[in-house]
Regions:
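Extended active-site neighborhood of metal-dependent phosphoesterases/phosphodiesterases
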Residues: 1-82, 101, 109-110, 131-185
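Active-site glycine-centered loops adjacent to acidic/histidine catalytic or metal-binding residues
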Residues: 12-13, 91, 125-126
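Short acidic, glycine-rich surface-loop motifs adjacent to enzyme active sites
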Residues: 81-98
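Catalytic-core regions built around general acid/base machinery
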Residues: 109-118
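Glycine-enriched alpha-helix->loop->beta-strand junction motifs that scaffold or abut catalytic
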Residues: 117-119, 148-149
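Functionally important transmembrane alpha-helices
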Residues: 121-123, 181
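Short, well-ordered strand-loop elements centered on a beta-strand within folded domains, enriched
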Residues: 187-191
Length: 191
């Protein structure tokens, strides 16, 4: 399938395993499965990368390892972005609809860059619920739809968690398998 349909995968916790010393490593199945750009930070090639597609820069980050190493790289990728729209995707969520599952470390590292470059949409997974925030800037909801970033957590598999109440979430769902359609038409990105 991956040889026939374009994919932009983000490595999750299940793509990693531990060796006999307890050190986590990316699965040996990852690289043969996908042919991905090699321009990510050293040591994260094919797990942190970006793709420009029809006016959209899609940036994939790796939330499993070397988080700090990706800060300067992400800053550079977004500073040199000629595309009209910017979408980030990664596995572990900054904001989650599942109770107690927000990721403060990711928020502290990456959110200032997301805000600085006015990223439009952040797609995340891991928490087996659905949640879509209002437009967010600096960790707070903004009132207009033309500024801030929308953060989405979604699930397509059968395992589900309970959703919680989160003040930034505009929509929440649990026990629901989903997929998303994103349409870009010039000056309009519809999610």
């Amino acid at each position: 399938v991956n040889g026939m349909l374009p994919s932009i995968p983000a490595a999750g916790n299940h793509e990693y395993g531990s060796d006999e010393n307890g050190t986590r490593h990316l699965s040996t199945h990852w690289h043969p499965q996908f042919t991905l750009p090699m321009h990510g930070p050293k040591g994260l090639e094919e797990t942190a990368y970006y793709v420009d597609y029809q006016g959209v820069r899609i940036v994939v980050l790796n939330t499993n390892e070397q988080l700090e190493k990706q800060v300067a790289w992400l800053d550079g990728v977004l500073a040199d972005n000629p595309q009209h729209w910017t979408v980030l995707t990664f596995h572990h969520p900054i904001f989650s609809a599942a109770a107690g599952r927000d990721n403060a470390d990711l928020r502290a590292l990456w959110m200032p860059i997301i805000d600085r470059y006015e990223v439009d949409l952040v797609l995340q997974g891991h928490d087996h619920t659905y949640g879509r925030t209002r437009n967010v800037r600096s960790g707070l909801s903004v009132r207009d739809d033309d500024s801030g970033t929308v953060y989405v957590v979604s699930v397509s598999g059968p395992k589900m968690y309970e959703s919680g109440v989160h003040p930034l979430m505009r929509r929440v769902a649990e026990d629901t398998q989903l997929y998303q359609i994103i349409e870009v038409d010039g000056d309009e990105l519809v999610y």
